[in-house]
Amino acid sequence: MNRVFKSGFVTIIGRPNVGKSTLMNQLIGQKIAITSSKAQTTRNRIQTVYTSEEGQIVFLDTPGINKAKNKLGDYMLMAAERTLNEVDLILWLVEPTTFIGGGEQYIIEKLQNVKTPIFLVINKTDIASEEEVLKAIVAYKDQCNFAEIIPVSALEGNNTDDLVHSIFNYLPEGPMYYDEDTITDQPERQIVAELVREKALRLLSQEIPHGIAVVIERMKNRKGRDIVCLLYTSDAADEGLGV
């Protein structure tokens, strides 16, 4: 008897800095999406691919969903919202130590008219008590019609195997969209550029805003490869801060 192969698209949403990129990196076992303490570190919709004998999951890591404050924020918000009705499953990440405030209510409003199944994924259980996790479950469970509520630690990988198994339960039978060795649709230069941007955001901390872009000028494929890149900021006054 042939095993049923399942496949589908899963988007990861949530307020900025709840661990969306960390979870995606953990699930595929490799660093693709960058992480930072700054809001909206993820600029574009990034696709990563998890493949096993059970099937294939294409994860979409989107910018954090929150009210936009500028044109860049508008674009990032539209990119996040556009995925909600285009996928087979939504993972909404929340923190157990954060109360349901305006940001969470904003996401709840966006999810009200969505027909896609939604998992509530309570992240950062490694730094929260069992009581805090239980309180979060009670607080959130009636906010949406959740298909599943699953506590995890994206950083340490706790309960992520159960999360993957539950995801496959909600995916349809389907084809393998990518070959089994593919883990992302991002070109190598884009991954390198994002890793450089991550370092810039961390090392320069408050000096440079998240309105920073990295362009790879040259990258040679050799041992001890040479990479030449340019950093652009949204404010000319920031240029000297990175020197």
Regions found by a protein language model. Name each.
Residues 128-182:
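Canonical P-loop GTPase G-domain recognition
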Residues 40-45, 63-86, 97-109:
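Switch II of P-loop NTPase G domains
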Residues 232-237:
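Conserved small/polar residues in nucleotide/adenosyl-binding loops
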Residues 39-41, 63-66, 96-100, 125-128, ...:
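Conserved nucleotide-binding/hydrolysis micro-motifs of P-loop NTPases
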Residues 159-221:
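C-terminal end of P-loop GTPase domains and the immediately downstream helical coupling element
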Residues 2-67:
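Conserved G1/Walker A P-loop phosphate-binding module
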Residues 81-146:
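Conserved C-terminal guanine-recognition region of P-loop GTPase G domains, centered on the G4
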Residues 97, 104, 115, 125, ...:
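RNA-contacting regions in translation and RNA-metabolism proteins
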